[in-house]
Amino acid sequence: MKEKTIIIVGGGQAAAMAAASLRQQGFTGELHLFSDEQHLPYERPPLSKSMLLEDSPQLQSVLPAHWWQENNVHLHSGVTIKTLGRDTRELVLTNGESWHWDQLFIATGAAARPLPLLDALGERCFTLRHAGDAARLREVLQPERSVVIVGAGTIGLELAASATQRGCKATVIELAATVMGRNAPPPVQRYLLQRHQQAGVRILLNNAIEHVVDGENVELTLQSGETLRADVVIYGIGISANDQLAREANLDTANGIVIDEACRTCDPAIFAGGDVAITRLDNGALHRCESWENANNQAQIAASAMLGLPLPRLPPPWFWSDQYSDNLQFIGDMRGDDWLCRGNPETQKAIWFNLQNGVLIGAVTLNQGREIRLIRKWIQSGKTFDAKLLTDEHIALKSL
């Protein structure tokens, strides 16, 4: 019996890890990966950090170049797909080539959610999703330049830190009343706001751009009436899923390809993962998780489902952010207002804990990354704690 052919569409973390997971879990059939980028699949997190700060930055490949040949995975780089061929099971490229598939994994990622007012600036306006974006930004982030960043989410704050470290004068504009409002708890939001302000970043909350004039400098008029002048304008206000191919194939989409817990779409032969995917929960709600770890997890889940194997158990959600000399790691549930703090954030060393009826459900570490493994184990086991003991620095965490 002929073995099936699996095609992966995409060139990022989820795409590469799907290929790796399929081979690791025993798939020996024909395996192809199609990407519209010329590079090997590469890590995205460094784009807002080391790719802007290091003297001679290099892209970090998800898998080494030799892995693809050794594992007999056919890479098709720099190609554009015309149709997925859902009915015919034939992927068609814009160059006329067609490729048969039995199962499909879509990991086409996402683009920056557009902001037409700033997009009208053309090359004077920047977003950050790909290696080419980072290369362009690196050229313009020069000392003493005035940089305006719209959006105070994770990427916006990382860009503010990198721009400041490159000698720029950074201003961040945020519509909400706080920074990192979607994915950090209140005490961490307050810490980050103060950290950036101490570094010289001006952060304007509860504000937005109303008018833009492109001249020698870019003039931005805010809702507050203030006018800012910028040499460089960057924005990051969310994502727009690259789900056009899926929509044209009549898959279920909602600013992302809708998947179930097995990463399966409404077509049982088509799977999706990473930033392009959005999961329908048991209660019918749609949930998106934009992180490096989620891309890895969904790649592994999809590979298992495609091969008819048991699905792996998911660890608590985890992501990290490097800003200035700080490394922050977020694990578990970030919801809730009653967070406990161990240590002193003013010394750039602390852990915030989220207890619910004594059970640890989430945590954020500040330059304490070595504790994440233990905290992950606690969250997975549903361990309960005495709040006083948990926050007492004289008691080693591993003894609790």
UniProtKB/Swiss-Prot annotation:
User: Can you provide one Gene Ontology molecular function annotated for this UniProt record?
Assistant: 3-phenylpropionate dioxygenase activity
- Which cofactors are reported in the record for this sequence? FAD
Q: Which UniProt keywords apply?
A: Aromatic hydrocarbons catabolism, FAD, Flavoprotein, NAD, Oxidoreductase
**Disulphide bond pairs:** none
Recorded GO cellular component terms are: cytoplasm
**Which GO terms are recorded in the biological process aspect for this UniProt protein?**
3-phenylpropionate catabolic process
- Pathway membership, UniProt: Aromatic compound metabolism; 3-phenylpropanoate degradation
Superkingdom, natural source: Bacteria
According to the record, the signal peptide region is none
Q: Which HAMAP family match?
A: HcaD (MF_01651)
- Describe, as the record does, how this protein assembles with itself and its partners: This dioxygenase system consists of four proteins: the two subunits of the hydroxylase component (HcaE and HcaF), a ferredoxin (HcaC) and a ferredoxin reductase (HcaD).
What is this protein identified as?
3-phenylpropionate/cinnamic acid dioxygenase ferredoxin--NAD(+) reductase component
